[in-house]
């Protein structure tokens, strides 16, 4: 029985029901947030553990285990940048370049401003042989963080693999200027120096790289390459050529040279390169237009020695010097110009050059043999004199990229018959294919002038020569095969000769048999619009130990 004073429960109002519903939603949201946080902490903990395990596996070079660990972790935590970044690096280290590049592209689509992953992407491109595509990516990463020396080293390596040795050398040297204890930068500079023909400099840089903890595998490869470059070689060969000595529009002597030679190379104290060559050549010049009892202007036997030293360890400053001696003897007394009392010739060569960023200034001097057909002042008889051509030149080369090269030269030459020549020239080349075989086109323009004409050698006055060429060259590691071919068209105008246009082709092939027997062949041939033909062949073989 209900008391009159006891009130019955009132039904809930709409406002009260809304408050109850909001409270319930708050409890549910808080529970879900706590559950998500707990799950995130668990996922983060698992991701961190996966990173630790994968890094340890990578340190052991167990890249397959590292990759599988990271892939499992990414299934539970697909947005984790650290997991994805390490996976991209592991795939690159294990040479799965396509997968690595795809992973990096996913990363950079999410985080385009990440310099670290941008550099990793560039590195994977370079390692996979796409150095051309890697270079702009490296530049973007460096623009985002120029203090990362590892990125700049990767950039320099990509430049070198792309053929831009000038740019690579300059970048490695900038890294070394920032940190002289960076072993990998010294190692990269060592490789570039060797590719520029300076193995003694590479040897010095490699030792610095080793002292500063450079990559051991890279050190081993560079040391093996230097050891191969230092191996002494000795060999023999044969050369033959036919040239034209044009002295007027109606006179073109035929100059022929044939004979064997022996040569050798060695490195003294891992510091100075040395080369020597001894040859025994037959030289003669024919005047086919003379209706006399002989068409020989001269007929000589030459015994020649040449020795050269190069001083390349002080890279980027380089120097070389050499001396040559020739002894002549007459082979045939029935000649128009018999050999006189002077039977010896001494020549020399010297060059100094340096790599200054993308510029290469140079200076040089040479003295080369040239046969002078003269008249004896005392007797009035014809006589052949072993004359000399002494030249000095200044040059400047510019390598703005892997594709483009330009150079210019100023030279002054003096002949023993009181003649002189001044020449100014320049050329430019463009490499339109950098894969093997490499293809390049070039164009050169040269102006020159002699003090006077000569009956002994070609003396075009106030001449302008245009030359355009196409060159193909390549290298194959199998058999250390080095090959190339070139075609050139040249056109020359002068004040004392009719216009001359010449087509010239040349080829070379060098290889190594059984790892220690280098063999080589070189040949060229030309024909001009006056039907004058020239050719030359050189065969060589040597042993390396």
Residue spans of the language-model regions?
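N-terminal secretory signal peptides that target proteins for export/translocation
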Residues: 1-18
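Alpha-helical segment of the N-proximal tetratricopeptide repeat
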Residues: 46-76, 86-93, 120
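Boundary at the C-terminal end of the N-terminal hydrophobic targeting segment
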Residues: 35-42
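Bacterial N-terminal signal peptides
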Residues: 22-33
């Amino acid at each position: 029985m209900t008391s009159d004073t006891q009130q019955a429960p009132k039904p809930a109002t709409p406002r009260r029901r809304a408050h109850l519903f909001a409270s319930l939603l708050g409890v549910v949201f808080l529970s879900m947030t706590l559950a998500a946080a707990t799950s995130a902490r668990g996922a983060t903990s698992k991701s961190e553990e996966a990173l630790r395990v994968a890094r340890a596996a990578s340190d052991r070079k167990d890249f397959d285990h590292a990759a599988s660990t990271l892939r499992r972790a990414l299934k539970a935590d697909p947005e984790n940048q650290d997991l994805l970044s390490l996976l991209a690096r592991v795939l690159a280290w294990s040479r799965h370049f396509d997968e690595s590049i795809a992973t990096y592209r996913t990363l950079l689509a999410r985080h385009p401003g990440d310099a670290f992953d941008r550099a990793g992407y560039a590195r994977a491109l370079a390692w996979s042989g796409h150095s051309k595509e890697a270079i702009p990516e490296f530049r973007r990463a460096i623009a985002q963080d120029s203090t990362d020396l590892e990125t700049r080293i990767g950039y320099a390596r990509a430049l070198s693999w792309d053929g831009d040795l000038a740019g690579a050398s300059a970048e490695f040297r900038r890294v070394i200027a920032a940190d002289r204890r960076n072993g990998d930068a010294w190692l990269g500079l060592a490789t570039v120096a060797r590719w520029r023909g300076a193995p003694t400099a590479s040897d010095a840089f490699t030792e610095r790289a080793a002292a500063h903890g450079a990559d051991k595998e890279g050190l081993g490869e560079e040391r093996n390459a230097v050891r191969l470059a230092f191996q002494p070689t000795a060999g023999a060969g044969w050369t033959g050529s036919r040239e034209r000595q044009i002295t007027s529009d109606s006179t073109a002597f035929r100059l022929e040279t044939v004979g064997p030679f022996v040569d050798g190379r060695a490195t003294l104290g891992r510091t100075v390169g040395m080369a020597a060559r001894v040859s025994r050549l037959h030289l003669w010049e024919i005047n086919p237009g003379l209706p006399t009892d002989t068409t020989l202007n001269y007929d000589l036997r030459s015994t020649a020695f040449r020795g050269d030293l190069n001083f390349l360890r002080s890279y980027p400053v380089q120097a070389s010097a050499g001396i040559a001696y020739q002894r002549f003897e007459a082979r045939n007394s029935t000649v128009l110009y018999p050999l006189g009392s002077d039977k010896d010739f001494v020549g020399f060569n010297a060059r100094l050059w340096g790599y200054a960023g993308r510029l290469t200034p140079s200076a040089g001097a040479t003295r080369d043999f040239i046969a002078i057909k003269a008249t004896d002042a005392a007797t009035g008889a014809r006589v052949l004199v072993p004359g000399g051509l002494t030249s000095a030149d200044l040059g400047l080369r510019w390598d703005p990229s892997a594709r483009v090269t330009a150079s210019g030269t100023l030279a002054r030459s003096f002949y023993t018959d009181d003649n002189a020549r001044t020449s100014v020239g320049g050329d430019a080349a463009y490499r339109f294919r950098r894969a093997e075989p490499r293809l390049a086109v070039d164009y050169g323009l040269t102006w020159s002038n002699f003090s006077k004409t000569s009956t002994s050698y070609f003396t075009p006055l106030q001449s302008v020569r245009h030359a355009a060429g196409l060159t193909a060259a390549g290298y194959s590691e199998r058999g250390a095969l080095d090959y190339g071919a070139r075609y050139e068209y040249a056109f020359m105008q002068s004040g004392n000769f009719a216009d001359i246009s010449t087509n010239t082709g040349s080829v070379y092939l060098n290889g190594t048999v059984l790892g220690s027997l280098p063999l080589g062949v070189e040949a060229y041939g030309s024909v001009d619009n006056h039907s004058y033909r020239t050719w030359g062949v050189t065969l060589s073989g040597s042993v390396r130990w």
